Amino acid sequence: MNKVFKIGLIGCGHIAETYFRAEKYFNNIKIIKCADINEKASKRCALNYGIKSTTVNEILKDKQIEIILNLTIPKAHYQISKKALINGKHVYSEKPLAINLNDGKKLLKISKKKKLYLGNAPDTFLGGGIQKSKELVEKNIIGNVKLGNAVFAFPGIQSYHPNPEPWFTKKEGGPVIDMGPYYITALVNLLGPAKKVTGTIIQGQKYRTIGIGPKKGKKFKVECPTTYLSTITFKNNSVIRLTLSFDVIAHQRNHIELYGEKGSMIVPDPNMFGGSVLTCNKLGDNWKEFKTTKMPLGRINIRTQSSRANETPTNANYRGVGLSEMAYSIENKRKHLCSGEISLHVLDIITSIMKAASSGKIQYINTLCVKPKKFSKLDIKKLLK
């Protein structure tokens, strides 16, 4: 029987709903208190989920809380996580780890000094889709991966989010900070650490119009680049072309394609947990499908659309498994999978892409991480209710 960790939630925005739902799937996490700088949001969250609303300072000082779940906006991630660590709490944060590399390094240093766990989303790479892809890559089904493409492109969230402005601000906005962590974390999981990046930016519309909610019809200024084109070279010499854009109305590209010496692979959406993996090993052959619907974290559990959790119908969403796996790792004194080291390396790649794009110069990645081990079925079953 796993220990149930008492969790304090800071940041009661839309994504919080997903972590409360995670309690239905995983047996070792329980959110008992919540806090937000917006007291109304905190009280509403507490009422909805039958927990206690409190202040940020009170939740950080609460001795019964063992893990702080940091769901604040990106620019607040560093300060909240730092305060939590200083107060002796383990931390699991939404992505990114911080909005600049130095702050990320500081968090990792504090966590190591105080012997605390620092975890970070995304945890989607633990799902059936990416784990099956990892299994096939490591079984050498397509041979050594030489190159590939990764694409996230859509017109932006302003049409369906009532408060889209933070996604377009100067320091924390743009597609690299928002969606980059999903794609880059998946690629690091499949190919290992990166060594250098290049980048180019495209500036889309100067103003966007909010399409829903009380501010519907209001225009706001775009302060950041809205398309990044990057090339990531990994330490194993694989080269991946990455496109991240808020300027594309529609496209028919696959999320990730890997091209090896013996074949090609289509990797499912790294922003979700399920999806089929496809491989082809001979020109003109049909693609072979590897379904993940019978895998523990690939089973379909979503039937309705929910932009709040980036969900699509007939898909799998088990967000929160990274938090659960970290809690299990704390109890069993082992290394967790959504680790601070991996998150810092991903942050290094993200900030380096932005620097490369603005400067026109190659940026070298200075952080290191170990490619995550496979998330075994046995370990998954230990966490599931």
Pin down the residues of each PLM region:
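Conserved SAM-binding strand-loop segment of SAM-dependent methyltransferases
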Residues: 50-58
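Predominantly a Rossmann-like dinucleotide-binding segment in NAD(P)-dependent oxidoreductases
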Residues: 124-221, 360
